[in-house]
Design a protein with these regions (language model features):
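Short His-Asn-centered micro-motif
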Residues: 180-184, 207
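Bacterial Sec-dependent N-terminal signal peptides
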Residues: 1-28
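ER/secretory pathway lumenal C-terminal domains and tails of membrane proteins involved
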Residues: 25-175, 193-349
Length: 349
């Protein structure tokens, strides 16, 4: 079985879901923005904090599944309008401060709004990931350590997701490397595990954060490259900077399917990540086997998306080990796990 062909096949379609659940749009049904008067004054009647925040988030993320390209002029104008409504009508609420944090991005001003939001909500745990992102970009290490620890101990991240991300890190052989992530199931668990797994030299690059100009400057500096112009698509930006660095760069399977398919000629499956660096077949095989031998608690995985990622790499390993008698024991173990997961999720066959 040819790996490139396999990458294009239905298994890849199964493991690469769209970034944001399209059902979020249906949650907005019935929520209508207040109409503007003829003189463009905002009508502030019966604003619901929760509905206004939902309206803001849907506007901000509505095109994210299409390569994150959502910072066009109309979108920015709409976000500014919603932000102004929040400031005028919601005053010192969690929702108003959170919207202002999002508007200001990963800046010192944005961080202050985030702290104010935390003071105005009982469910402080829902902000852990925001504090992690903001402190990471602003290089506030004590704050970053504080909130990654809080997140790790919060129970928000299940054991199976933690184990999966331990195996993601064990798929990466070069410590001083960069891994491009996309979602809740990899970005924050990985950040919380770097110290624990002795991978502090590994840099996590979240695709959504690249929309923030300060974050782009930070990543370009860490990659040792110039900061290229930005065309509203973080993946184009990542691929551009990747051509100017010798650093090892990896993609996780949570990235949009279109992105991985477009970059497939440059991607090599290693463990449960994709290497953007060119590798020989023998080197791929060596790294895949090493990653597999370090994998832990695969049997815990019950999430269908995570199972699909494992099934994909098991199929890659099966192909690589098919004619290697010295690795027959490894092959049998791989096949046993694959059979076990397919029995649990027959739709992934």
């Amino acid at each position: 079985m040819n790996i490139t062909t396999y990458l294009k096949a239905t298994v890849l379609g199964l493991i690469l879901a769209a970034t944001f659940n399209s059902s979020a749009q249906s949650n907005l049904d019935g929520i209508k923005g207040d109409e503007h008067s003829d003189d463009n004054e905002i009508q502030l009647t019966n604003e619901s904090p929760q509905e206004l925040l939902l309206e803001y988030e849907i506007e901000r993320t509505k095109n994210f599944s299409n390569g994150y390209k959502s910072t066009n002029r109309t979108t920015l104008d709409n976000l500014n309008t919603i932000s102004n409504r929040a400031q005028l009508s919601l005053a010192e609420t969690y929702e108003a401060h959170y919207i202002q944090y999002k508007q200001n991005g990963f800046t010192s001003v944005g961080l202050e709004f985030l702290k104010n939001a935390e003071q105005n909500t009982e469910n402080k745990a829902e902000l852990y990931s925001d504090f992690i992102a903001c402190s990471h970009v602003l290089k506030k290490e004590l704050l970053f350590d504080k909130y990654t620890s809080k997140l790790r101990n919060s129970g928000f991240i299940t054991n199976e997701v933690l184990e999966y991300n331990k195996n993601v890190l064990r798929s990466i052989e070069t410590e001083a490397s960069f891994i491009v992530t996309n979602g809740w199931e990899d970005t924050y668990p990985l950040l919380s595990l770097l110290t624990q797994e002795n991978k502090t030299a590994t840099q996590v690059i979240n695709a959504e954060w690249i929309l923030d100009p300060e974050y782009r400057k930070l990543i370009a500096a860490r990659l040792g490259t110039s900061n290229p112009s930005f065309n509203d698509n973080p993946y184009d930006w990542i691929l551009t900077v990747s051509q100017s660095t010798s650093s090892a760069i990896y993609f996780t399977p949570t990235l949009p399917r279109s992105v991985l398919l477009n970059a497939q000629e440059s991607l090599t499956p290693i463990g449960i990540v994709f290497s953007l660096n060119p590798l020989t077949a023998s080197e791929q095989k060596r790294q895949c086997i090493n990653a597999w031998k370090m994998f832990s608690k695969v049997e815990l995985i019950s999430n269908s998306d995570l199972c699909a990622n494992y099934i994909f790499i098991f199929s890659v390993l099966e192909d690589l080990l098919a004619n290697d008698q010295s690795e027959k024991g490894t092959l049998n173990q791989v096949l046993a796990y694959k059979k076990q997961l397919l029995k649990k999720y027959p739709a992934l066959k």
